[in-house]
Every structure is written in structure tokens, then in C-alpha cells.
Amino acid sequence: TRRDWGHSKDYVKGIWMILQYKKPEDFVLSTGKNYSIEDFIKKVFKILDLNWKNFVTTNNKNFLRPSEVRSLQGDSSKARKLLNWKPEYDLDALCNDMLLNDLKLYGMTLEQAKKIAKKLSKK
């Protein structure tokens, strides 16, 4: 399964730009790139210095939705052309920001999470 993962900061900026446009129009905001969920997981686990294969099962049909869309990728060419909008955050930045935000919710730093992750990987 592949998705067009984008950062909320890019989308909020794009929405603001759409609202400033001279007339009502339909726009698609997307990165125009799609990545597998495995790509996403690898990046997050890399930040934590973990081997994702020790924690994640892939290709198990029990975890697939019956009507799963295999690939979703947006075409933001209209927004890029008329609004001069483009995403500023790549998948690495998205993964990093999401992880750091979740850690903050738990009152943890990245270094604390890495220590816990290291202990878990030894089990």
C-alpha cells in the first residue's frame, strides 16, 4: 500500500493560499510522491536506531482492508502553478516531527526513547 504522505504545515499553508486566491477554485494539495507504509516505518525506526523488522510484520493479509486502495498519489500541479504552492517538508521531516510530537505527549525526549528502544531490541 502506497500513500502520498504530506505534512500538515504544508497543507495549512496551502489552504490559506487557496483562501487568498482571487476567485473560488478547486485545488488539490499533495506532495505528488507516494511511499509505502514500509518506507514510513523504516524512517521512524531509523530515527530510534531500531531494526524495524524486529517489531513489525509485513505482508500479512490479516492486516489488509478488504477493499484497500493500493496506491494514492495526488496531482497538485494546479496549486503549484496558480498559487505558487509547493510542499516544503519531505517524508523525513514528517516522520521526525510526528515522532517528536508523540514523544512530547508522553513527556519524553528522543534520547530517552532511544534508551527504551535499545532495551526493547535486546529482548
Language model features with spans:
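C-terminal substrate-binding subdomain of Rossmann-fold SDR/epimerase-dehydratase oxidoreductases
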Residues: T1-K123
